[in-house]
Amino acid sequence: MTAKFIVIEGLEGAGKSTAIQQVIDALAAHGIENPESTREPGGTPLAEQMRALIKEGHPDEPLTDMAELLLLYAARIQLVDNIIKPALAEGRWVVGDRHDMSSQAYQGGGRGFDKALMENLRDTVLGDFCPDLTIYMDIDPILGLERARGRGELDRIEKMNVDFFHRARARFLELSENNPKVIIIDAGQSLENVTSDLKQALNHWLEKQ
């Protein structure tokens, strides 16, 4: 079986970390051990420095929306070229915490950047590279933010108003619905039901590979 790139997407508080572990466990059950785990933004020394700027900003200078967007893509291509593509070439599966869909949703939907700009930037930076499977953990923004606040202090993105996250969710759904490479999981259910739905959908996908 050819190595695949699987990405978990979703709003804050959607349960991505739990879902990632469930994906890793499901892969192991199919004999796929020790996948490369990545996160965005971040995942390489340079990309982690960019992550810090994106997440926390700078006390003496505001980070503009365009600078944020370009930092995200700079961090992304560092990760893709230096970690993800080499791992796939070596036959290792990759499980990612966020990828390009997050930028399309947060910056395109939430920040309001033009769709054509977002698509052109994606195509310029990534070309035709994309995940083999994206698992989108869908959750109502209000519930998701309640969960996120329960984890502790929020970063600069998590502090955005709820309308930002409603716009981001709408774009996530727009990108996910009727997309054969995306599985949508209702993350607002109980953990037991989320786990069951995710396991069933992922096993069905793996059996077809």
UniProtKB/Swiss-Prot annotation:
It comes from the Bacteria. InterPro entries: P-loop_NTPase, Thymidylate_kin-like_dom, Thymidylate_kin_CS, Thymidylate_kinase. Keywords: ATP-binding, Kinase, Nucleotide biosynthesis, Nucleotide-binding, Transferase. It is an enzyme of class 2 (transferase). One of its GO terms (biological process) is dTTP biosynthetic process. Gene3D superfamilies: P-loop containing nucleotide triphosphate hydrolases. One of its GO terms (molecular function) is dTMP kinase activity. One of its GO terms (cellular component) is cytosol. It catalyses: dTMP + ATP = dTDP + ADP. ATP binds at G10, L11, E12, G13, A14, G15, K16, S17. Its EC number is 2.7.4.9. The keyword Nucleotide-binding applies. Phosphorylation of dTMP to form dTDP in both de novo and salvage pathways of dTTP synthesis. HAMAP family: Thymidylate_kinase (MF_00165). Belongs to the thymidylate kinase family. This is Thymidylate kinase. It comes from Photobacterium profundum (strain SS9). The gene is tmk.
